[in-house]
Amino acid sequence: MKIICNICYKETILGPEEKEKYFPNDPDDSIRYSECKECRYKRLCLELPLIYRDAVDDYNVMAKLDINKSYFFYGDTGAGKTFSAIEILKRRWENGQSGRFISYPELIFSIQTNYEQNAEMVDEIKKYKQLIVLDDFGAEKMTDFVRQVSYLIINYREQNKLQTIITSNFTLDEIDMYIDRRISSRIAGMCEIVRMSGDKRLTKK
């Protein structure tokens, strides 16, 4: 059986075991058109901020991280929090897995602009079954509304054991003090806490 990418037209021949696993009802000499892994990866990378699309892991941070875990990366601006989160996301994409990158301040702004229109977005994000990266949590202006939306998302994902990576300039203690104790509690229960130092190297708490 032959698979042809509908973007780059690269051809892949499936062996009998793969064919039986993925397309058991197709004839052995059939042809399917489907996006190849490389084209899928390039398409997904277009959803990332431009500066991270082709970033290189010079500090080898991935040697210390598990692409299937939830993390809370905290530290000063420029310490490598977003880079590390995106590296995990990109590795999952390379493996054919799914995941989404979300700028948290932009999400909150969209929701505040028209909550009724964007309420479904909150529900979709909190229930998304694959990895969600919530980048720059706490950078948005904190109001009771923002606290409630944040709690709804993080509480649901913690309770349902959905992989989540959160980046923030705040420590958990600061989230506890300035944002919401319930949120810091859920993050602590869901994520491995990793402090990012100024030289972009990882130090586990």
PLM-predicted stretches and their roles:
Residues M1-A63, I193-V194, G198, K204-K205:
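A short, basic N-terminal segment
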Residues N68-I86:
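Walker A/P-loop nucleotide-binding motif
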